[in-house]
């Protein structure tokens, strides 16, 4: 028995040792693996250094709350395919802590999920923490409750603001650390930003502003997270913060890093101009963007971020004052996440060209030559080697210029830069687009646009409301960001002897408002509405009225279009009606601001009851819409989801101003009655993400402020970019895709490097029709080409032969392809090839 016991004991001991050794080996292996995945991020005067390697960084801003989690994977994937290796995002304090101490990291607020998706795609992350972000986002990302902290002043050396900011900053960064998302932990976050464009307000706070910036710098630096930190538009950023540039042309406007050991970083290269209600269409050409990026990299830049790369949607009430629901739609990826060509493709080619220059840019010695008034040569080379890259710039906006460099002559197009990754071969020119173009189409849905059965519920105009103020309550403080709407009521008496009797003398109500909009009623009669604009928020509403002897009752509805998102002393910004008077009385002007008490309440009854949801619908009595309704009316109907899987929109034809919900989800604010100088609404289509929709019986609820609208004119549409074009000149540089870099030499991938035009349909679609083709001097843009005075007659025939029925086609751009009889009726014309095709799925489309 003792022997058997001893044997068992020995066996157990051996097993313990073996298991212990195995566990120890596994632990060491895991530790080694973890250590290997951790990346140290440092920097010097040339670039960021990630895991010991210098990097050129092409980054794009994508904001997680401005798209849905279902959209994130495709948006991030397309960003990577566009040549980006980094995604930049703000962190939105008022999204994550809408109420003090109550946090939200779910749905569109799931920051961790968003960052992990970026990591899954093998990309880096730049985290712009705030606390203030601007971003055309309501209140600049600061939560409303912060305004009500006693004694607080935002963004300065203020105890209360710093205490709340530190708590927020530590909460976010601790969360990132817990999820091991910093590069030093093996995560994708390589760079952080604290504060945002502070120099714009610093002067207002004097020494307190300087103290605050130093405090913010010390706060993030003290957390020792293993990543560098930047401050944008902050040339005096304290060490170790890296001062970075924001703007359109940082290659010319950025004074450079404030220390020799800091790299040149560009945190915002604006891809377009954000739009506000009342704006006409605006755009920034991709040629200008490409020129600015090439120039920045030619002048020691090693990081650029496109703001925005995908703008997305300001869902619900999240936009800043007057900002449209659609955000940065002209970015390389449009509001729906579709590739906007040629902006997407031309920048992708730029990134390819810069990558061919990577070694010279990061390790070469910079040199500059100025051969002419409008020309410049910047190049990087390593003496004694073949490593060399050059940027030949022509700043003449009217004419091409010839530049002689290293024994060769190069013709450079007007206001452009040619990139030579070996100082010999031109692989890219910023003004010569060889990538395809697209035109976006909104196709009326057959499935969703069945006859709508609208039902309506109209808000009741309040009578006398409780209140003791002789001055109308400030509207931001009244609504507390719970609603866009605040009611004001007052009563005033007019003696019959004070009513005008003289012919031509009339009485008027005048309301001076600080913004944003208002509606007014006198004695139950609707007087009308007024509004300011993004540039001029204050306005005066004046209307002729009929007063009665005795008591008169005035009702005003103050309307917000979002909170301000910029400027100093934001916590003291005011809006809403401020001065109200009655003009035309024989006794003189009656100032209701001083002589009457004002009652208040906030919001619509429908909002409080949640009648934009299925559950809330039952709480009020809906009536059938008979074709006409007053203002402040709710409209509801049901619709089936639009066909296909394409992005869906609602077009708000016939409507005025208000809010949209689908299945309880806030689509955003619309404002069709605020026309641009072109006589059109700034935004017509409003994005309904597919994740908001069910196959059938989707609830549409609209709150409309204005009377006599026509909801029957609204419709649903699906979005595509099935109109695909090319516009290539015969003297253009062939695509950079022909080139690669091997053993420090730029080499052609193919035997024949020739100029071609490429047309490619999205998904599984194929080219179904050639809608336009001309080799000559055609004019116009994709979606609207016309023939010029010169055209090869066989142009369409050639394109049809190359392209019909194919998902992708490549067309040689040369005279021999289009002038098969070798006759050229316009020899002195430099030929352009313009092609427009339609993609589809045949009869099933």
Swiss-Prot record:
Which GO cellular component terms, listed alphabetically, does the Swiss-Prot or TrEMBL entry include?
apoplast
Catalyzed reactions = Hydrolysis of terminal non-reducing beta-D-galactose residues in beta-D-galactosides
- Localization, UniProt: Secreted, Extracellular space, Apoplast
E.C. designation(s): 3.2.1.23
This chain is glycosylated at 104, 269, 300, 395, 752, 784, 814
Which InterPro entries did the record assign?
Answer: BetaGal_gal-bd, BetaGal_jelly_roll_dom, Galactose-bd-like_sf, GHD, Gly_Hdrlase_35_cat, Glyco_hydro_35_CS, Glycoside_Hdrlase_35, Glycoside_hydrolase_SF
Q: Where is the signal peptide?
A: 1-26
Q: Does the keyword Magnesium apply?
A: no
According to its UniProt entry, one GO biological process term is: carbohydrate metabolic process
Q: What is annotated as the active site?
A: 197 (proton donor), 268 (nucleophile)
* Keywords annotated in UniProt: Apoplast, Glycoprotein, Glycosidase, Hydrolase, Secreted, Signal
Q: Report which superkingdom the organism of origin falls in.
A: Eukaryota
Q: Does the keyword DNA repair apply?
A: no
Q: Name one GO molecular function term.
A: beta-galactosidase activity
Q: What is this protein called?
A: Beta-galactosidase 11
Species name for this entry? Answer: Arabidopsis thaliana (Mouse-ear cress)
């Amino acid at each position: 028995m003792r022997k058997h016991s001893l044997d068992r004991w020995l066996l157990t001991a051996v097993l313990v040792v073996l298991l212990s050794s195995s566990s120890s080996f596994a632990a060491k292996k895991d530790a080694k693996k973890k250590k290997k995945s951790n990346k140290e991020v440092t920097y010097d005067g040339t670039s960021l250094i990630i895991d010991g390697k210098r990097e050129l960084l092409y980054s794009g801003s994508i904001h997680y709350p401005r798209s849905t989690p279902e959209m994130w994977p495709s948006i991030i994937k397309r960003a990577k395919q566009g040549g980006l290796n980094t995604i930049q995002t703000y962190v939105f304090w008022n999204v994550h802590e809408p109420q003090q101490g109550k946090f939200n990291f779910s749905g569109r607020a799931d920051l961790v999920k968003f960052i992990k998706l970026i990591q899954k795609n093998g990309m880096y992350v730049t985290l712009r923490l705030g606390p203030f972000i601007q971003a055309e986002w309501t209140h600049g990302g600061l939560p409303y409750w912060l305004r009500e902290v006693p004694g607080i002043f935002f963004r300065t050396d203020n105890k209360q603001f710093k205490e709340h900011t530190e708590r927020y900053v530590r909460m976010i960064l601790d969360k990132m650390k817990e999820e091991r998302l910093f590069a030093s932990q093996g995560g994708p976050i390589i760079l952080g930003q604290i504060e945002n464009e502070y120099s714009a307000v610093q002067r207002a706070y004097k020494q307190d502003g300087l103290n605050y910036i130093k405090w913010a710098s010390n706060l993030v630096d003290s957390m020792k997270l293993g990543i560098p930190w930047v401050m944008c538009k902050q040339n005096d950023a304290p060490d170790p913060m890296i001062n970075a540039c924001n703007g359109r042309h940082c290659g010319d406007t950025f004074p450079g890093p404030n220390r020799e050991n800091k790299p040149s970083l560009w945190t915002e290269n604006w891809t377009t101009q954000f739009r506000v209600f009342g704006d006409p269409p605006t755009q920034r050409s991709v040629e200008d963007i490409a020129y600015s990026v090439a120039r920045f990299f030619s002048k020691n830049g090693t990081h650029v971020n496109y703001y925005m790369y995908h703008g997305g949607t300001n869902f619900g009430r999240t936009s800043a004052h007057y900002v449209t629901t659609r955000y940065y739609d002209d970015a390389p990826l449009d509001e729906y996440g579709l590739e906007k060509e040629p902006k997407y493709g031309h920048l992708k080619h730029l990134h390819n060209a810069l990558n061919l220059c990577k070694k010279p840019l990061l390790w070469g010695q910079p040199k500059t030559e100025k051969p002419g008034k409008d020309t410049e040569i910047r190049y990087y080379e390593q003496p004694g080697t073949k490593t060399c890259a050059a940027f030949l710039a022509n700043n003449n906006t009217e004419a091409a210029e010839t530049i002689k460099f290293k024994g060769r002559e190069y013709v450079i197009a007007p206001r452009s830069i040619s990139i030579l990754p070996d100082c010999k071969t031109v692989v890219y020119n910023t003004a010569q687009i060889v990538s395809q173009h697209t035109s976006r189409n909104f196709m009326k849905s057959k499935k969703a646009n069945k006859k709508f059965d609208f039902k309506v519920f109209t808000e009741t105009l309040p009578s006398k409301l409780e209140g003791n103020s002789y001055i109308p309550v400030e509207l931001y403080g009244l609504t507390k960001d719970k609603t866009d709407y605040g009611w004001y009521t007052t009563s005033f008496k007019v003696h019959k002897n004070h009513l005008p009797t003289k012919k031509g003398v009339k009485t008027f109500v005048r309301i001076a408002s600080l913004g944003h909009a208002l509606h007014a009623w006198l004695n139950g009669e609707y007087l009308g509405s007024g509004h300011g604009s993004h540039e001029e928020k204050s306005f005066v509403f004046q209307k002729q009225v009929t007063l009665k002897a005795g008591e008169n009752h005035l009702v005003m509805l103050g309307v917000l279009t979002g909170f301000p998102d910029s400027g100093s002393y934001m916590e003291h910004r005011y809006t809403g009606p401020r001065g109200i008077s009655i003009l035309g009385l024989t006794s003189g002007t009656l100032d209701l601001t001083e002589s009457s008490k004002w009652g208040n309440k906030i919001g619509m009854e429908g909002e409080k009851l949640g009648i934009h949801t299925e559950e809330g619908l039952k709480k009020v009595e809906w009536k059938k819409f008979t074709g006409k309704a007053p203002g402040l009316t709710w409209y509801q109907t049901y619709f089936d989801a639009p066909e296909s899987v394409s992005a869906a929109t609602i077009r708000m034809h016939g409507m005025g101003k208000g809010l949209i919900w689908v299945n309880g989800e806030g689509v955003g604010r619309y404002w069709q009655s605020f026309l641009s100088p072109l006589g059109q609404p700034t935004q017509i289509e409003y994005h309904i993400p597919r994740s908001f929709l069910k196959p059938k019986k989707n609830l549409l609820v609209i709150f409309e402020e204005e009377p006599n609208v026509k909801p029957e004119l609204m419709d649903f549409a699906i979005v595509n970019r099935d109109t695909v074009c090319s516009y290539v000149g015969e003297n253009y540089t062939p695509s950079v895709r022909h080139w690669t870099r091997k053993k420090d030499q730029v080499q052609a991938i193919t035997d024949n490097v020739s100029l071609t035009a490429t047309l490619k349909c999205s998904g599984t679609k194929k080219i179904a029709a050639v809608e336009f083709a001309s080799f000559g001097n055609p004019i116009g843009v994709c979606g609207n080409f016309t023939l010029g005075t010169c055209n090869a007659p066989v142009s369409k025939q050639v394109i049809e032969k190359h392209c019909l029925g194919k998902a992708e086609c490549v067309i040689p751009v040369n005279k021999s392809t289009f002038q098969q009889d070798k006759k050229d009726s316009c020899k002195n014309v430099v030929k352009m090839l313009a092609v427009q095709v339609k993609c589809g799925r045949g009869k099933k489309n």
